[in-house]
Each structure stands twice: as structure tokens, then as C-alpha cells.
Amino acid sequence: MRTYKLTIAYDGTRYQGWQRQANTDRTIQGILEKIISEAVQYPVEVNGSGRTDAGVHASGQTASVVLPGAVEEGFFTDYVNGKLPHDIRICKANLMKNGFHARKSAAWKIYEYCIDTGMKPDVFRRRYCYHFPCEPDLEAMRKAAGYLK
């Protein structure tokens, strides 16, 4: 068995989050599993380092998939990417030691939030930034963030 670590980027606007769901095909995990399963001609499970909600984007989410044998270099980044929708990409694929699991092996995660403080929403960043047309109270935000540790 071969375990691969996938680094994935996606624009989650059109999707119902990461986790596969019985009532929709519009999840990142579900689409990855469908495309990879079709490519290797047997069912696979893609495990994410965490779940995202509907509409959430990721620029470097880690996932893992176990295949019974090695695949050619470029299988994920060329072949699978060629079958994925334009808003989901496998940026990198690495062969890992058996036992690697994206969620269980995760040491840390980074969450980034974008706040647009302009008077009007930025036309190019409107899908990726929360529009708040005031200066935020940075000290209060720092204090609140301290409670998350």
C-alpha cells in the first residue's frame, strides 16, 4: 500500500464544504474521491486534515489517500488535475510513510481571514473578503484572539 499526501487549493464558492455528503455531489472530498477512483478504477477514500464549511476556500489544505501501488510521477498534479473542475487543484503530491493520515498527523493549522475596510466592497476580492466599511478595533481583536489559544 502507498500513502500519498496531497496539498490542495480550492475556491469553495460553489461547494458544500469539504466533507462528502449523501445529499449532494458538490463537496471537495466527494469530487476528489470520484475523479481519483475513476482514474485508478477502484474506490478510494481521500482524508482531509480538517473540514471546511460551505463556501470556504483553502490555499494549502492537506489530504491523504492510500493506493495499493505506486503511481507515475505527475499522476495527481497532471492527470487528476486535468479531470478536476477549474476551482479545485492538487498543488503537490508526496509519497509518505505508511501510517500518515492527513487529520491524525496534522501538527498545526492556519486560518486566515480577510477583512475589506473600504467604503465599497473590492470588486475583485469580494468573494474572499468580509466587507466591513469601518476601521476595526485591533486591540479588541487581539484580546479576543487570545481566548482562542
For the regions a protein language model found, what residue spans apply to each?
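Structured-RNA-binding interfaces characteristic of tRNA pseudouridine synthases
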Residues: 1-149
